[in-house]
Amino acid sequence: MRKYPVLIIVIALLFVLPLLITGCQSSRDSINGKVVEADTINEDNNEQKEDNKEEMTEEEKKAEQEKKIAERAALEEQRKKELGDFYVPLLPLDDEREIEKVEAKGLYVTGNVAGMPVDKANVEMYAEYIKALYENNSSKINELKSKVDKLNKFEKILGIAVATEINTLVIDVKDDNGLMTYKSDIAIVDQVGANQNVRIKDIKGLMELFNEYDIYPIARIVTFKDKNFASNRTDHAIQLKSGGVWRDNKGVAWVNPYDKFVWNYNVAIAKEAVLNGFKEIQFDYIRFPDNAKKYNPITDFPGRDGRDKDEAIEDFLEYARQELESYKVNIAADVFGVITKSWDDEPEDIGQTWRKMAKSIDYMCPMIYPSHYSTGWYGYEVPDQHPYGVLSAALKEAIERNASLENPPVIRPWIQGFTASWVKGYIKYNPKEVRLQILAGKELGINEYLVWNASNVYDPLAYFPIEEENNVIAPDKRQDIEKDLIGRTPDSVMKDYLSAEKNKVYSKMYLLTPIDDRVFDYDEFRTSIESLNLKLVKFDVKDYKVIDQNNAEVKLSYEYSQQIDDKVLRVINEDDTWKLIKENGIWKVKRPDIKPMQVEEGQ
């Protein structure tokens, strides 16, 4: 009688074991990473959900929407508690915007000008007048001249956008005094009195106007030069060690760039600007005050915690990027023109280092105004007299710096749209001088630009191509594969690299080393080169061969020495070949291992 249970168990196992084996196999497949079936199931489930959604009744759809609204309301209440006086709502649930990329060609507009009344008929009339100017239609010019003289600045700017290549306007949101140009609903903005001088009465109406004229709006936020905030919340200003608030030569107090309270203030204003319709946030004065040597000994920056100034700016931009990510907006930063040449914030000491800032932004906007360069820059006695030359030289430096980054931002320079009559030997900046700056960028593949004129007076003829632009071919479209974006051949890059090594200009070596062949941190890179204890005695670059668009070889000879105690090791190579690759459009040197072997005693 006891045999039957055993028989039943055996029969059961015969049925169950295959199922167990199949289950184990499925588990093993999952463990081994074979998740295609699971992904397929998920996709099927998602498709099923979509099908079900389509099959939902109107009542069910309404219930689902009400649920989303309730969840969002709860989230916003939570955010209000967390953000407090810095609270700004998220994008509306029904806002399905995507980040818009535009090849921007833009003009700067103050809050005063952007707040001027607009008659669309006047805008169209000015556009017609511009066309007549361009075509040299004297009868139409004479017909409209007396009328257009009566138009306000903003109507003329909009007319320029209608009639020329201008498609972007940079509008002050928080101005150079720290005041809002339109009324903000952010609690902290009201508390510090930043709403006291509102000039744009209808920000939504302004955005509708931009949409109508297909204008890309950029919100300029003057970040750390904010005398209003610094004066009203002195505990968040740059402090004097002796007590009280530090002020610059013009008596202006600055906020402390290390202070996260200040970060939250500027980021909140940026968020609200997005909600109002701006498609890009441009942080200006994203730096410490200049003349650092004068104020460094007497000032204190609470919250510094041993960080360099450029770390504070780097950290702020990364924080802003994270906070603005869900707002679907581009981020730009304005930097001094000299940042294209200086390294690690030296000697300026204002917190601006190209590679550190570039990691967290979409657009880098160096302010390359020829009038702002002193005698000797780029070999010019009066740089202001050379709009093309200054732009070309500075942008080549910018391109080289950008190429050292894994995900570089777009370079979009600010150019000079004004006459710098205070400069000794200045020239008048007419349309040709403005256009020569644009030409310099085009020749280097940089088609974007922003024009600065503090008075907002722009000559429309500056925004039509000149004859020299007709034959410009962008570097990446040229047939000459030997040259990189800034016109260098492999042998010239090799000479630059070895000259930098010989003279211990490690920053240049950093820029000309492929990204995967070095660390990102420059100090670590420099230490790694110095630790080799190699001295380049001499070199001679003989010839080069371009293998394809992105690879080349250079033949060279060189001599290195290495001092170890009382011995000198040398390596002499009369016929070596080094490889170069083109990365982000720039030729870079793949450095081989150099191992000195020959020993010379007692040298």
Describe the role of every protein-language-model region.
Residues 216-226, 282, 309-350, 406-418:
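Aromatic-lined carbohydrate-recognition surfaces of secreted/lumenal glycan-active proteins
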Residues 491-492, 503-553, 562:
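Short solvent-exposed beta->alpha transition segments
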Residues 162-198, 290-299:
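Aromatic-lined carbohydrate-binding/catalytic grooves of carbohydrate-active enzymes
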Residues 473-503:
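Short, low-complexity N-terminal intrinsically disordered segments enriched in polar/charged residues
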Residues 547-603:
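Exposed beta-sheet edge and beta->alpha loop/turn motif
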Residues 152-178, 275-280, 444-447:
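Catalytic domains of carbohydrate-active enzymes, especially glycoside hydrolases
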Residues 361-375, 387-392, 397, 402-475:
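Substrate-binding cleft of secreted/luminal carbohydrate-active enzymes
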Residues 95-151, 208, 219, 224-275:
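Active-site-adjacent "subsite" loops/lids of carbohydrate-active enzymes
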